[in-house]
């Protein structure tokens, strides 16, 4: 495998070393972009191992920061494309990895930049900035750009993604993600494993694309958003805002769901409801 040749020496396990690098580059971690550095090497290795990178696979990394994960990834992949929004971090990444043939740096917002990139890739990785995690995942699903992904996100969001039917965390986002991916929890990570230490816990999830039979994604997405906007109301009181032909409410296929709240309807049932409603349009 290809080895990374560092032009800068950062000890990613040392808060002192990280602080020194940030001081030299006049960088302060920004909460806006979720800039917290994972300083536990064992956890970093475990996360990368969960990607199960095969030889010749091409990887995207979103928000590499100082490059702790990037350094490991470059030893395992023939091509790593890294998207970094912060220009000062981009400068560090260029200094460290810019001469490597298997490294490509894209400067700017991932959501704006990725549509212009070659999408012939195998997997996506990120310690996603907490404030954009749901946006990134939703956008990739909406664009039907479904790849095997390993994301570290705020535990609160991970709990929504992995939620079971009939639970308080079961939401439209749960249904959106689980309708497109098999979700596997890799590890929970306490705040003490980061610098600066966040007040919240993090969770690493693996998302594996799965086949679905959603006939009209826009209608499906609109349906789940509509009914979960009033999650305590029964379906008969919320679905009326979604359908145009009220006669559909008298159809047998809907009757078993009308007195249920959205949190009591499974992912598969939402797909069935959406597909049937689509057929009536």
From Swiss-Prot:
Domain of life: Bacteria
Family stated for the protein in its record: Belongs to the class I-like SAM-binding methyltransferase superfamily. rRNA adenine N(6)-methyltransferase family. RsmA subfamily.
Signal peptide extent: none
Chief location: cytoplasm
Substrates-to-products reaction catalysed: adenosine(1518)/adenosine(1519) in 16S rRNA + 4 S-adenosyl-L-methionine = N(6)-dimethyladenosine(1518)/N(6)-dimethyladenosine(1519) in 16S rRNA + 4 S-adenosyl-L-homocysteine + 4 H(+)
E.C. number(s) listed in UniProt: 2.1.1.182
Molecular function, one GO term: 16S rRNA (adenine(1518)-N(6)/adenine(1519)-N(6))-dimethyltransferase activity
UniProt KW Hydrolase keyword: no
PROSITE patterns according to UniProt: RRNA_A_DIMETH (PS01131), SAM_RNA_A_N6_MT (PS51689)
Gene3D superfamilies the record matches: Ribosomal RNA adenine dimethylase-like, domain 2, Vaccinia Virus protein VP39
Binding site for S-adenosyl-L-methionine: 36, 38, 63, 84, 109, 127
Keywords, comma-separated and alphabetical: Cytoplasm, Methyltransferase, RNA-binding, rRNA processing, S-adenosyl-L-methionine, Transferase
Subcellular location: Cytoplasm
Organism the protein comes from: Borreliella afzelii (strain PKo)
Alphabetized NCBIfam families for the sequence: ksgA
Record-given protein name: Ribosomal RNA small subunit methyltransferase A
Stored SMART domains: rADc
Record flagged with keyword Kinase: no
Lineage of origin: Bacteria, Pseudomonadati, Spirochaetota, Spirochaetia, Spirochaetales
Annotated S-S bridges: none
GO CC, alphabetical: cytosol
């Amino acid at each position: 495998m290809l080895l990374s040749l560092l032009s800068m020496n950062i000890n990613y396990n040392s808060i002192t070393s990280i602080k020194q690098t940030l001081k030299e580059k006049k960088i302060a971690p920004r909460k806006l972009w979720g800039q917290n550095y994972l300083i536990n090497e064992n956890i970093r290795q475990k996360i990368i191992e969960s990607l199960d990178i095969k030889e010749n696979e091409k990887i995207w990394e979103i928000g590499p920061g100082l490059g702790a994960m990037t350094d490991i990834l470059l030893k395992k992949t023939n091509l790593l494309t890294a998207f970094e929004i912060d220009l000062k971090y981009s400068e560090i990444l260029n200094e460290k990895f810019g001469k490597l043939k298997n490294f490509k740096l894209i400067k700017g917002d991932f959501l704006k930049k990725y549509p212009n990139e070659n999408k012939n890739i195998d997997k996506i990785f990120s310690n996603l900035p907490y404030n954009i995690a749901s946006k990134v995942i939703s956008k990739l699903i909406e664009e039907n750009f479904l790849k095997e992904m390993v994301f570290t996100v705020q535990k609160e969001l991970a709990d929504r993604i992995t939620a079971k039917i009939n639970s308080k965390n079961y939401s439209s986002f749960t249904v959106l993600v689980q309708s497109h991916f098999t979700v596997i929890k890799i590890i929970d990570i306490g705040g003490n494993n980061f610098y600066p230490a966040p007040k919240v816990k993090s969770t690493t999830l693996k998302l594996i694309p799965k086949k679905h039979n959603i006939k009209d994604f826009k209608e499906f997405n609109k349906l789940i958003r509509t009914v979960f906007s009033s999650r305590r109301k029964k379906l008969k009181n919320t679905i009326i805002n979604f359908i145009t032909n009220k006669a559909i409410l008298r159809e047998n296929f809907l009757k078993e769901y009308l007195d249920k709240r959205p949190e009591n309807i499974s992912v598969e049932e939402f797909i069935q409801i959406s597909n049937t409603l689509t057929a009536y349009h």
